Amino acid sequence: MNSRILILDCGSQFTQLIARRVREARVYSEIHPPTKSLDWIRAWKPTGIILSGGPSSVTDEGAPTIPPALLDVAPVLGVCYGMQLIAHLEGGSVVGGGRREYGRAEVTVDEASGMFAGFTAGEKTTVWMSHGDHVEQVPPGYVATAHSGNTCAGFRHKTKPIHAVQFHAEVHHSARGAEIIENFLFDICHCAPDWTPGHFIDLEVAKIREMVGDRQVICGLSGGVDSSVAAALVHKAIGDQLTCIFVDTGLLRLHEREQVERTMRAHLGIKLITVRAEDRFLNGLAGEGDPEKKRKIIGHTFIDVFEDASAEAGKNAEFLVQGTLYPDVIESVSAKGGPSATIKTHHNVGGLKPDMKFKLIEPLRELFKDEVRNVGRELGLPEEMVGRHPFPGPGLAIRVLGEVTPHALDVLRRSDAIYLEEIRAAGLYPDIWQAFAVFLPVKSVGVMGDGRTYENVVALRAVTSTDGMTADWYPFPYEVLGRISNRIINEVDGVNRVVYDISSKPPATIEWE
């Protein structure tokens, strides 16, 4: 892997999208604050540099900036604020006030080359704008490449590989944004598309083997995508030196424990210890209906159970595997170069007590979620595991509204299983970000046969999303909803009514608790 793009985050909400678009083009990228020193950047040897957008004005005191010499280290692309920063540093004119552009806009291409290779001069394209300031005059030695109304929407240096666009090419609303980014990667930076799951696995396996040697490793397995892929990757590197611990909280979905055991033991040959702690969790939750208190009870109980299990199973272990992903690692105040709240400097992981001084192995810390799924597929994990929807840490406890009881969990498990089975049968599962059933703490009157019933209500939730930050309810075909409702009412004892949640996020959250 020789090609890599350095993204300097000037504070944009879209910076992670830039990294994702670059990765989707199979080029490795990392996000760092613009306060990184010139020496550090040169030593990192970027194939290209992208300056992100941001909320500041380039003339603000303390606004993100870069040393001008950075523009000579590698080809540079400035996006939104990044474009204004280049103009400011190179002697152009950036002004605020006047016409502000937010949302979709139409840009006219002035020069059909460089960033706009594949376009035609005079062609209009839809893009996503989010700026108040704009470049009034391009710097000496630069030429405009696109405009929006009377405003410069792109420029380039006449002889150096320095390019900029005022719009957010990384956002899906920019119709040909991916093409524009790929022009920078391949035509201007001459990157090689060598960032692949297989290449990543080879590099990570070698790294893990060197780090671990012949020592023992434990992994807390949740059954979710991240911990499962992390375990499979570490197992590929060190085999039976890895022991996984899976805690059955009693709050799992139908047959979930059996599925995890089957995948890990039979399919992958991973040493797995299953801890049956259902009674411990349910006893702790008895009588508690407040969602935040339920979360805390589950969190504290899990820590106690895992510590007991790891003290026995991992008594000789020196390393702990954690499924940290790249969004967790990116420095939280990177635009100002502040310290990261998520980069770990100690061994107190996920609430575990400080005296559990394992060394961390975080094999997925360079990956986004979609890349984790692809690595899992490359490692041979079944699609039912790598393609599964997100599942909350507290499990079904936050999908039983109010007190968690064995009866409520049983009704919810069986309703949820029918729901997901029908979604898969209709071929809709991959189109949905998350789908699940909710047990409501109310009963309703119904009629079955000649008799009156007074039974439980189950709500169904399904949303589409790209990142979980915002979400829209999924528009099921009526016949699918009808089939799901009919099966739940007829096959799950104690349910006589099914409702579908058509709330978007915001204002509603995806989960009910």
Curated annotation (Swiss-Prot):
Binding site residues for ATP: S222, G223, G224, V225, D226, S227, S228
Limits of the Glutamine amidotransferase type-1 domain: 4-194
Keyword Transmembrane recorded: no
Organism of derivation: Gemmatimonas aurantiaca (strain DSM 14586 / JCM 11422 / NBRC 100505 / T-27)
Ligase in keyword set: yes
PROSITE patterns reported in the protein's UniProt record: GATASE_TYPE_1 (PS51273), GMPS_ATP_PPASE (PS51553)
Catalytic activity reported: XMP + L-glutamine + ATP + H2O = GMP + L-glutamate + AMP + diphosphate + 2 H(+)
InterPro entries: Class_I_gatase-like (IPR029062), GATASE (IPR017926), GMP_synth_C (IPR001674), GMP_synth_GATase (IPR004739), GMP_synthase (IPR022955), GMPS_ATP_PPase_dom (IPR025777), NAD/GMP_synthase (IPR022310), Rossmann-like_a/b/a_fold (IPR014729)
Name the UniProt record assigns to this protein: GMP synthase [glutamine-hydrolyzing]
Record's GO cellular component terms: cytosol
GO molecular function terms attached to this record: ATP binding; GMP synthase activity
Domain of life assignment: Bacteria
Transmembrane segment boundaries: none
CDD domains: GATase1_GMP_Synthase, GMP_synthase_C
Pfam families assigned: GATase, GMP_synt_C, NAD_synthase
Pathway terms, separated by semicolons: Purine metabolism; GMP biosynthesis; GMP from XMP (L-Gln route): step 1/1
Description of how the protein assembles with itself and partners: Homodimer.
Function: Catalyzes the synthesis of GMP from XMP.
Active-site residue numbers: C80 (nucleophile), H168, E170
EC number assigned by the record: 6.3.5.2
Keyword terms, alphabetized: ATP-binding, Glutamine amidotransferase, GMP biosynthesis, Ligase, Nucleotide-binding, Purine biosynthesis
NCBIfam families: guaA_Cterm, guaA_Nterm, PRK00074.1
Occurrences of domain GMPS ATP-PPase (ranges): 195-388
